Swiss-Prot record:
<comment type="subunit">
    <text>Monomer. Interacts with NAXE and NDRG1.</text>
</comment>
<keyword id="KW-0558">Oxidation</keyword>
<dbReference type="GO" id="GO:0008289">
    <property type="term" value="F:lipid binding"/>
</dbReference>
<keyword id="KW-0873">Pyrrolidone carboxylic acid</keyword>
<dbReference type="GO" id="GO:0042632">
    <property type="term" value="P:cholesterol homeostasis"/>
</dbReference>
<dbReference type="GO" id="GO:0030301">
    <property type="term" value="P:cholesterol transport"/>
</dbReference>
<keyword id="KW-0732">Signal</keyword>
<dbReference type="GO" id="GO:0042157">
    <property type="term" value="P:lipoprotein metabolic process"/>
</dbReference>
<dbReference type="GO" id="GO:0120020">
    <property type="term" value="F:cholesterol transfer activity"/>
</dbReference>
<dbReference type="GO" id="GO:0034366">
    <property type="term" value="C:spherical high-density lipoprotein particle"/>
</dbReference>
<feature type="signal peptide">
    <location>
        <begin position="1"/>
        <end position="18"/>
    </location>
</feature>
<keyword id="KW-0345">HDL</keyword>
<dbReference type="Pfam" id="PF04711">
    <property type="entry name" value="ApoA-II"/>
</dbReference>
<dbReference type="GO" id="GO:0008035">
    <property type="term" value="F:high-density lipoprotein particle binding"/>
</dbReference>
<keyword id="KW-0813">Transport</keyword>
<keyword id="KW-0964">Secreted</keyword>
<keyword id="KW-0445">Lipid transport</keyword>
Length: 100
């Protein structure tokens, strides 16, 4: 019985000591968290710039731009033509009642 009581007492003291040590541990403050965040973002940016310098990525970007331009040019021309036609029809409707 004494052994059981001693074991429970020892367990209670150890758990209280552990909680006390955890409270005394230094918690990271906001300034260090912000500094760590900016350092991580800076490192990521540097890695991204190094990857972007590669000729393979530049070639992919150029090919993507050219493909997009090829697909969008006819659409933009058609939209411009449709807009001109719409505006000319609108202007024709305004001038007809004035001449009658």
């Amino acid at each position: 019985m004494k052994l059981l009581a001693l074991a429970v007492l020892l367990l209670a003291v150890c758990s209280l000591e552990g909680a006390f040590v955890r409270r005394q541990a230094e918690e990271p403050n906001l300034q260090s968290l912000v500094a760590q965040y900016f350092q991580t973002m800076t490192d990521y940016g540097k890695d991204l710039v190094e990857k972007a310098k590669g000729p393979e990525l530049q070639a992919q970007a150029k090919a993507y731009f050219e493909k997009t331009q090829e697909q969008l040019t006819p659409l933009v021309k058609k939209a411009g033509t449709d807009l001109i036609n719409f505006l000319s029809n609108f202007m024709d409707l305004r001038t007809q009642p004035a001449t009658q």
